Amino acid sequence: MAFASSLLALVALAAVTSAAPATTQATCPDGTKVNNAACCAFIPLAQDLQETIFQNDCGEDAHEVIRLTFHDAIAISQSKGPSAGGADGSMLLFPTIEPNFSANNGIDDSVNNLIPFMQKHNTISAGDIVQFTGAVALTNCPGAPQLEFLARRPNKTIPAIDGLIPEPQDSVTSILERFKDAGNFSPFEVVSLLASHSVARADKVDETIDAAPFDTTPFVFDTQIFLEVLLKGVGFPGTRTTRGEVASPLPLTSGSDTGELRLQSDFALARDERTACIWQGFVNEQALMASFKAAMRKLAVLGQHRNTLIDCSDVVPAPKPAVNKPASFPATTGPQDLELSCNTKPFPSLSVDAGAQQTLIPHCSDGDMTCQSVQFNGPA
């Protein structure tokens, strides 16, 4: 569609400020050739992360670390003074402070899981560990882009300021202003970053339910999130006891297979005149999901100077290939359930999944009810 083409053009026009020039190419101990010898340290870290935490799965441990990369980076402010915050690993360096901010509820699991890696791979800074771990986690999610990774962030000595992380109950105006203050993010970049909600689940929005997914394919980096947030809500997967949640189109829950939870902020961004057409433009446009990479390229260096960092993107593992399944209306939903606020662009023609009843969203990527997960004890 024409709108998708224009958005792809915006992705292509992303800033191309270079990192520090690579030094002489090097061969790492395992035989991998890299553009800078400093990148070799991340190869055993990637292997350690996959074997110890992720098991090459786009599961809960991967989801939580991807969330950590965002929460660590966005806590910086141009208006309040960027003396602290940004993508600096301060979540790991101050585990008894930042994880206790209300917006970071539940992030202690990923913080505690990464602290041992900071100790074991002690030549790598906390900020590098957070962003590299997020890049590795994302490679386990089919369809995800291979993120840029720049190394040699210094360790910070003070924690970030509280109150800088957007929350699901925030208004669209508040969210857009927060992103602008953090790093001059455009509305398109904000929506692009929310592509990560395609592989996300919530434990703390409604604490009566566990690992509530935001779409029906939480283990695949696809565009279902952008379609399903546009559908009419009919109920709640849990008890609706907290702020930040609105009715979901697919709330059916059975045992550990939790129904879809809809964030109030996603609902609002999909319907606001400033972002509705951007949101709608992502539906069934898998190529546009690559804009997440461009937006993360910017987010991952907030508070840093790109020209002092080293490009180690060549040690980020190759992601799993896309599933290549077009977006579709889940069973029991259809075009009649769309709540569209963008009237200037045509909506794509999509198929409807067969079934007279709502299909349960599996708790685990293999369809099982019990998933292997890692949880280390720690200070957070």
Swiss-Prot record:
GO terms for biological process, alphabetical: cellular response to oxidative stress; hydrogen peroxide catabolic process; lignin catabolic process; response to reactive oxygen species
Catalytic activity, reaction form: 2 Mn(2+) + H2O2 + 2 H(+) = 2 Mn(3+) + 2 H2O
Cofactor(s) it depends on: heme b; Ca(2+)
Protein residues bound to heme b: H197
Residues binding Mn(2+): E60, E64, D203
Residues of the signal peptide: 1-25
Record-annotated disulphide pairs: C28-C40, C39-C312, C58-C141, C277-C342, C364-C371
Main enzyme class: oxidoreductase
Keyword entries, A-Z: Calcium, Disulfide bond, Glycoprotein, Heme, Hydrogen peroxide, Iron, Lignin degradation, Manganese, Metal-binding, Oxidoreductase, Peroxidase, Secreted, Signal
Cellular component, GO annotation: extracellular region
Site (Transition state stabilizer): R67
Sites where the protein binds Ca(2+) 2: S198, D215, T217, V220, D222
EC number: 1.11.1.13
Residues carrying sugar: N100, N155
Single GO MF annotation: manganese peroxidase activity
Residues holding Ca(2+) 1: D72, G86, D88, S90
Keyword Membrane annotated: no
Subcellular location field: Secreted
Active site positions, chain numbering: H71 (proton acceptor)
Entry annotated with the keyword Calcium: yes
Cofactor note: Binds 1 heme b (iron(II)-protoporphyrin IX) group per subunit. Binds 2 calcium ions per subunit.
Function: Catalyzes the oxidation of Mn(2+) to Mn(3+). The latter, acting as a diffusible redox mediator, is capable of oxidizing a variety of lignin compounds.
Family the entry assigns: Belongs to the peroxidase family. Ligninase subfamily.
Protein name per UniProt: Manganese peroxidase H3
Source taxonomy: Eukaryota, Fungi, Dikarya, Basidiomycota, Agaricomycotina
